[in-house]
Regions:
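N-terminal secretory signal peptides that target proteins for export/translocation
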Residues: 1-3
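Contiguous segments within soluble domain cores/interaction surfaces
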Residues: 5-15, 20-129, 133-149
Length: 149
């Protein structure tokens, strides 16, 4: 009779242990599956790897609600500056399903693969995307930069 109680208590203990483990796994599972947010790196390879692009505000800081000038630097994957590129710019807020409030343009080639982008404006806080369609001697490619305010 004592051995039956021993097995019963051992079984209950094992059941409690497994229930505790399952509770921890259940509570932690949502955290494991959560996205960490958009990639906000300022330098990256283009979609097909033809170019390495970097993007930064000319004034050094992102300002909400102000018309800004940014610098886009384009290099080949071998590191040579990309000269004479045609650049089309679009974008918007993916979570709000609207485009940019302005029409940014590549206005000047500054040398060493650097292009001035004028007319960038972020009217509200949140996640913004800027899409660059690049056409140059090396070919055509795209790159997308995320900006979170």
């Amino acid at each position: 009779m004592a051995s039956i109680w021993r097995y019963l208590l051992a079984g209950l203990g094992l059941t409690a242990l497994l229930a505790g483990i399952l509770a921890v796994v259940y509570l932690m599972a949502p955290q494991w599956g959560q996205p960490t947010g958009p990639d906000v790196s300022r330098s990256k390879a283009s979609e097909n790897g033809l170019f390495v692009a970097s993007f930064q505000p000319e004034a050094g800081a992102v300002r909400q609600g102000e018309l800004e000038t940014w610098l886009l630097t384009l290099k080949t994957k071998a590191g040579a500056p990309v000269e004479g590129a045609a650049i089309a710019i679009s974008g918007g807020m993916p979570q709000h399903d609207h485009g940019l409030p302005t029409s940014p343009q590549a206005t000047d080639y500054l040398g060493d693969g650097q292009y001035r982008i004028e007319g960038v404006k972020f009217t509200m806080s949140g996640w913004w995307q800027l899409h660059f369609a690049i056409s140059a001697t090396a070919g055509s490619d795209t790159v997308v930069f995320n900006v979170v305010l």
